[in-house]
Amino acid sequence: VKIGIFGAGAVGGHLAVKLHRAGAKVSVIARGAHLSAIRANGLTVKSKEQTINVCLPATDRAEELGPQDCVIITLKANALPYAAAEIAKLVTPRTTLVTTSNGIPYWYFYGLDSPWRDHVVESVDPGGRLWELLPPRQVVGCIVFYAAEVIEPGIIEHTYSNRFSLGEPNGNKSARTESLSQLLSEAGLKAPVCANIRSELWLKLWGNLAFNPLSALTGLTVDRLTSRLDLRNTARAMMEEAALVAKALGISFSMSIDERIDLTGSVGAHKTSMLQDLERGRPMEIDALLGAVVELGRLTGKPMPQCEAMLALVRGRARQAGLYPD
């Protein structure tokens, strides 16, 4: 099985190292100094338990790799529309596409038994370009519960969790999800197959849609955001609005809002991905984590004043930093 990992950052690089070490035929698409370091010294993952270094094929040109049996897309959601044509060079009608981006994915409404079946979410897929180039029928959803960062080119530090939940958008069990789960499990990762991947998606997003923008605006880590009553209440109000949208889409949560907030706080002095991106001068996943949720609120007729206000503020902060279009 030929596996191409598009985006060898913290998540993609970790997957590449683990899968390669387990005997899979893995190649990575990377760029810049990170790519140069991988070519020169291999790819390294450090954790409290061990340090692993592997040498594997790496390029910034997808056509050098050719068609893959499985493509794991580990780009940020905001980068995906710009990379879609390059990713498509790895894809045949038989290729399995695994998406790992945070937030609402472009394929969210594919085959969904709802009035909005096959609706294109413009916030993450302007004009339906992703839907066209990366067909949702070939997608396996993957929700990542994992914390790591690239601490220097070619070196990733893994700090928290290693869970990669998998699921077909239509909820069916399939040979491809089962084989992918087995492959990841053999690589030492937790890879449960979920009957409803959207529920898993919303459980992660429920916290992210509030605490990512809050962290970008305040500069605070999640332990401080969840322990300050005023900020906790702000997050709770946003999450209450989002829960009504989720309910309208057939999603119910397995925990209360406060339990979800406490789960976020339990990670400790962790900077959200949005805050990390802001500090490094990189575009943030504003539209996937919050803009798309507000879009779904309008679609389902659920008012979201708190979320809309937060969206305006964090977009303003991003524009001030030159990281969001006017």
What are these regions (language model features)?
Residues A37, L90, D125, R129-K204, ...:
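Internal alpha-helical scaffold of NAD(P)-dependent oxidoreductase catalytic cores
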Residues I52-C55, D60-I151:
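Rossmann-like NAD(P)(H) cofactor-binding subdomain of soluble oxidoreductases
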